[in-house]
Amino acid sequence: MRFEEIVLPGVVLVNVGLEKDLEKPLEELSLLAKTAGYEVRAILTQHKEHPDKAYYIGTGKLLELKSVAEATESEVVIFDNELSGTQLNNLVQALLVASCVYA
């Protein structure tokens, strides 16, 4: 009998804000992603007072996120922040991921 390896779609979780511990709110989001059938492969945070109009995150963090998504072969990026339609579209185009969503 042969068992095939099941590879779950990879996801990167992102949180932006001014809170001291930006990873804590991502614990619940991580559980939700796992329940939905995703494997959380990375978590990124950014302390930022005002969101960038184009990407929500700054351009330096955008480059880091793209690098992490590529290195971990993650197809999905989930933000724990509310993004505009323009920001979502810009992120998908810049990151070359299957989808970018916010929770």
Regions of interest found by a model, annotated:
Residues M1-A103:
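N-terminal accessory targeting/assembly segments
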